[in-house]
Amino acid sequence: MGLFSRDKPKIKIQTTKKDGFSGWLKCTHCNELIHANELEQNSNCCPKCDYHYRLSTEDRIKSLSNPNTFKPLFQNLQPVDTLNFVDTEPYPKRLANAQEKSTSNEAVVVGTCMINKHKIALGVLDFSFMGGSMGSVVGERLTRLIEHALKEKLPLIIVSTSGGARMQESILSLMQMAKTSGALAKLHEARIPYISVLTNPTTGGVTASFASLGDIIVAEPNALICFAGPRVIEQTIGQRLPPGAQKSEFLLEHGMIDCIVKRPELKQKLAELIDFLKGNFSEENEPSPPPKNLIKKTSPLKDKN
C-alpha cells in the first residue's frame, strides 16, 4: 500500500449539535442547550461553559475591527502547484475544493483596519481552508503584511490557527518559516509592536515561527498550542502527555505565553496592549509601566475529556 493510497481516516469536525427545536443548539462541550442568537452575540463562545468555538476569518475580523474599516491587501496572490503534487488527489483539486467551501481564497486574510482609535495591520489565518496550513502564498501574504506595517509604521496583529506547514508544498512551505521570521526581525528592529494571538489549534511550523515571535503573545482559553500534537507524540514515543500539557493555561503557567483573554474581551484588550506597546516602542518616549490588570492570569477552563 502506497503512502498516499491508504484509506482516508474519518475525522470528526467539532461543531455545535443541532437540536430538535428551531434555533436551539447543544454545546458539544457541556451538552447544555443554547440559542444560536445567544452564541453569535457571545462571539461564538458557549454562554454556559465558555467553550470557544472556531470563528471564520470574516467573523474574526468583524469581532476585532471597527465596523467597515477592514481593507484587504495582497488578495491577488494565488497558490500554484509548483511541485505537481498528488496524494489521494491532485493539489489543484484540493485548492479548488477548499476555495469552494471557504469564504477565503487562501488560508490567510491580511489587511489594515481600525481597533478603537488605532490603525493596525491585521492577519487572520483560516482553519477551514486546508487546516490553516502555511504554504507559499500564506507566507508571502504575511511577509508583505509585515513589510507594509514596517513601511507605514503600523502595529501588527496576527491571529493564528493552523495545523502547520502545508504538506503539498514540501520544502517551499517550510521556507515560509524563515521568511516570516526574518521580516519580523526587521519589524522588531524598527520598534514597531507585534501582538501574536493564538487560537485553537495553533501547531506545527506556524507555532515554530511567526506565532511565537510576538512582543506579547495572547491566547484564547483552552487552546491547543504545540509543535507536534498529542496523538503524534504518543505514536512516536509510546507515552501520553499529562492532561492539558499543550493547552494555553499550561503554557501560561510555564511562561510560554503572556496572557489568556476570553474572546468577547479580546478587542478591548488588544487596544490596551497597543496603547502600552506604542508608548514603550516609541524612541521619543520613556518606557511606561503597564496599566493595572493589563496582563493577568485566568482560571483554567476544565476540559470535558
Swiss-Prot record:
Sites where the protein binds Zn(2+): C27, C30, C46, C49
Transmembrane segments: none
This protein's pathway: Lipid metabolism; malonyl-CoA biosynthesis; malonyl-CoA from acetyl-CoA: step 1/1
Localization (cell): Cytoplasm
GO molecular function: acetyl-CoA carboxylase activity; ATP binding; carboxyl- or carbamoyltransferase activity; zinc ion binding
CC cofactor note: Binds 1 zinc ion per subunit.
GO biological process terms, semicolon-separated: fatty acid biosynthetic process; malonyl-CoA biosynthetic process
Required cofactor(s): Zn(2+)
Record domain CoA carboxyltransferase N-terminal: where: 23-292
InterPro entries xrefs: AcCoA_carboxyl_beta, Acetyl_CoA_COase_Trfase_b_su, ClpP/crotonase-like_dom_sf, COA_CT_N, Znf-ACC
UniProt-annotated stretches for the region Disordered: 281-305
Keyword Lipoprotein among UniProt keywords: no
UniProt key word Nucleus: no
PANTHER family associated with the record: ACETYL-COENZYME A CARBOXYLASE CARBOXYL TRANSFERASE SUBUNIT BETA, CHLOROPLASTIC
Assembly: Acetyl-CoA carboxylase is a heterohexamer composed of biotin carboxyl carrier protein (AccB), biotin carboxylase (AccC) and two subunits each of ACCase subunit alpha (AccA) and ACCase subunit beta (AccD).
Job of this protein: Component of the acetyl coenzyme A carboxylase (ACC) complex. Biotin carboxylase (BC) catalyzes the carboxylation of biotin on its carrier protein (BCCP) and then the CO(2) group is transferred by the transcarboxylase to acetyl-CoA to form malonyl-CoA.
Protein name from the UniProt record: Acetyl-coenzyme A carboxylase carboxyl transferase subunit beta
Naturally occurring in which organism (per UniProt): Protochlamydia amoebophila (strain UWE25)
